[in-house]
């Protein structure tokens, strides 16, 4: 009907239009004759516009007649035809295609910098026109204090001893037997204020001042282990009255995303989960009022509002809008990437984190350091867009920035200055300088106000800003500032406002969100299901690998247990069938264990999204469960199809399908179990340890390793709780109750099959098969429920951070202490600081840390090009080129004593150029010349004379600051530098970089624990400086720092340059002070092209003069930061506006010609000069490298309590459990089953704890490997000393672990107490655990990532398990596989232990189903193939295994580099 009506209307319109056109043309011809073509054209244009307008009105009238539900889903989009005619189409907004979205966004935001404000005003005007009020939120906080408890001093370091003492103290504290040794640490102290809507607030404060804690508290996301006191209200309502996590959005400074998803997919998922909020209700009311008023809305605005008001869409127009304003549209379809997967840049990743919350409907935003990694121009644009949103849409917003440029600072309405947990100022930006002048401090000319605000509370920096020369300067502390602000006019006004309660009844009903989630439960499930399916597709390699692995294992199993070798029907024939059944079972279980690593890997993103109420835990867990069911079906089917009939199991078809069902049940149970363990453990080390321990208990009590009848009576409950027992019963009953095992026997059981089941303690009726199947699926359900419960109630394990304690404060705390508190980072009081705020140095300051001699070197590069293989995702978009060019004809020169800045917008290629010049690229294709003081660069020698400060600040987490520096100096300074000189040099560098107060602080992991970002930056700089290099590359040394910390780093850099070194820095957001501290600039644009290379000049006048000579470039204003102005005027949009290519302008300039002459001069060796030469590749000898690496590994292991404390704890627990389960079995060898139980005990004792070691060590080695890549690139050591140190320290801890384990097992199992037997027992277990650890290390070295390493490890462990001699004794292994028995290290260990402990015994042994007896040693030789006389060979074989794995590990890290740069 609607289409018919619309068609009739259009026909009438066209008919009327034709008649009107004819009449008009006739009258025109009559009046003007045929002579006025101009008038005719104008009239024709006017007529066409009228017709188009009329057509638009008619189409809107048709839409307006639709029912409300349909009307809100229909919009109009215009299309400009090739002849210039505009046609309006009716579009279903729920089915917008990519092209439709692109057209709509282009029509709304053609040039985002110019059009965004106008677009937002058009949106707002539409609501204002019909009198709809937009909800607003005012946030108040009164007497807000946040604190926590922390250990201080040496107790703060997480050593094994401290961890043990802390655990004991915590347990005793629960029962009030021991007072806590923790100290109270205050993070925020009695702060009050108001965050107003429609005003954008800047939060300033040095790292450690409590900014993150403050923002989290306002957003209702304070850490659970912190004490929060005071009152926070939204429009007068406290947190319990609404859902603060959905009313507001906290944007973290840490970028946690799924690397497998593209930028667009990441934002689409966030938008889908967060929902549309009140956008749909607003649209309903808006549409109703417009219809009543007869108002026709702007079609573009109407289409946008409708497209963004429909929830549950897989992809939304709001995503396209956010991508556009954040500048992410250029990388929208590129993977986000992670540590081992190439993706977008760090700055782009930071914007993705911001965009993830902007796509949601929140009305208040608390943004934590959103500019980290962004250049000042990009930051300015993003903050400008935020300002437009705040002012036009009445949003409440607080943004924390570290180094805001003056023009970015001017965008804010209000400023909060936070220092040492107290508010120093809160109020209008315009009045902030007035307050500090009221206090006696004035901001100097050309000093950024933000920088001044950060420094004026510092004791060291404060005096330089004192302007009341008539009065003597006295230091004003932070509490004094805070108190004075309360008596300042603005402070008094805030206090007065806080005394007047907010009128809760005037609050807009849509302002505060009462629903916990943004969409319905079904939509949440669909969203998470879609994402899980996407992640599975992107990780398809893992599943293909797993499927291939199980196929290979099934093939091996069928050749080991080949049908032709498998006779059935008698008790003697059953051994191989038991082995085949148990191997199948254990293989399926181990295959499920790979789920553990994959789940732990996903948890950080899950916790972030769960806490932001994207979805509940069940919505995350159920899709994983559902989508893994087909995986279980496929993997189980592959195993059964390949093995069932080829091995020769019961031939009935029904039994084939019953075994398949059993294996599906076991596989589902295993996947669910390990998912639950991953969620409970939450970290790789803890989860791995718990996983292996659980496997151990499930297997031991499962009825195969030890039969039910031999389990202690008081532990029989464990037998019935073991899921493995039900799997074992199901497959055994299915096989042995078949007709071919029904031959009668003379024993207590009527048939052979039942005799075999009874001997193993299994059930003997068919009904128990179905009971077992029900139990397996019941366990699967239970573990999935527990998985959901763990995800719902558990939080990430609270890692610790170092806290510096004040010196000389009112509590008389001792200096140079560190304290540990969960997720707290406190700064030192400014009384403790020993820094200057400006880059120029006092005249009396000595330049320390550079006393060792060095050779000044220059670096010249000419016509450098760099290519990488074209990314697959770009090829899918139609790009045909095979290579992507990242650097294009880059040329320049860096000279001694000259500090060069390498600047460009995000993605310009700054880091790429630096990596190419420093020789840090691991892939790609490099063209062009690079010369060092006239000679072609040789990377081996260049590494000795250069330093590279990486952007990511990678360091070993478990050593202190002083140890990191001493280690670097030890390995990188010349071997003739004496130890005392080296230590003095380190001390001087620490003073230079101002790390003295942090000498004993633990480094920690970036973004997790340990040092703050700015402290880590200074450490990175110091680590390179102690190497005494001639050329230093610094990748964004000031990124992530506040202005004061950046000044400290740059002052250090300046001192370094003034000693005659060559220093190059990439830099993102330089203040005027920092930018003008550089001597020269190399400016790049997107595409990797140089657009300026030359001197800056006094106050950057040479740079300014160069760009101002280019026609059309706007002049710089007096107050502008030259760095920001430079990036603005050279941006891509400015190029498009001026129709100019700045790279081409530079290439045709005189400056370029002069630079080419300089490059030519520096590329020619000086007279009488020599090329760099070192007699050895490394500074230190092989022995010294080993000593240094071992020294660092020693401290790393001693402080890695999570790894070692858990390892020793599990060793004791497993040892005791084994001892209890196998109590005195060594003295009770009378029956064949007794000996098999003992063999099972030996097998389990070495296999499971050994596998635990192999699995747990992988995460330790993986973390250290990233540090190894940096240190190797720096030429610190060769691979063998590193491998030696890693292996040596692990071996020492294994030796201690083995002693504890051996003592427990040997004494409790009841082996014969002789020195020789105990030595053998200890030796074999020690060597076993050692080669297991070496194996874990080796697999990490050979694989690119932790997940792949876990899969590869379990694959070969299955081999070792099959050929260990337990599942199938060596004499029964087919001759074509018997060689692999000797290739299984576990087989040698079991051989060694069993032969040494019982191989010489001559006791009589009863055989199952036989009347004759046999001596133990004879049985071992005949049935198991163990000979006591072969022990010496076994002893030396273990040495061979250890050495083999060690050398493969060493050569793996030597020749394989999985770091992608």
Swiss-Prot record:
It is found in: Membrane. PROSITE patterns: ABC_TRANSPORTER_2. ATP 2 binds at residues 904-911. Residues 523-736, 1184-1398 form the ABC transmembrane type-2 domain. ATP 1 binds at residues 205-212. It holds the Pfam family ABC2_membrane_7. Keywords: ATP-binding, Membrane, Nucleotide-binding, Repeat, Transmembrane, Transmembrane helix, Transport. Its main location: membrane. The chain crosses the membrane at residues 541-561, 577-597, 622-642, 660-680, 685-705, 771-791, 1203-1223, 1243-1263, 1291-1311, 1321-1341, 1348-1368, 1379-1399, 1430-1450. Residues 172-445, 859-1111 form the ABC transporter domain. InterPro entries: AAA+_ATPase, ABC2_TM, ABC_trans_N, ABC_transporter-like_ATP-bd, ABCG_dom, ABCG_PDR_1, ABCG_PDR_2, P-loop_NTPase. GO terms for molecular function: ABC-type transporter activity; ATP binding; ATP hydrolysis activity. It is a multi-pass membrane protein. GO terms for cellular component: membrane. The keyword Transmembrane applies. Belongs to the ABC transporter superfamily. ABCG family. PDR (TC 3.A.1.205) subfamily. May be a general defense protein. This is Pleiotropic drug resistance protein 2.
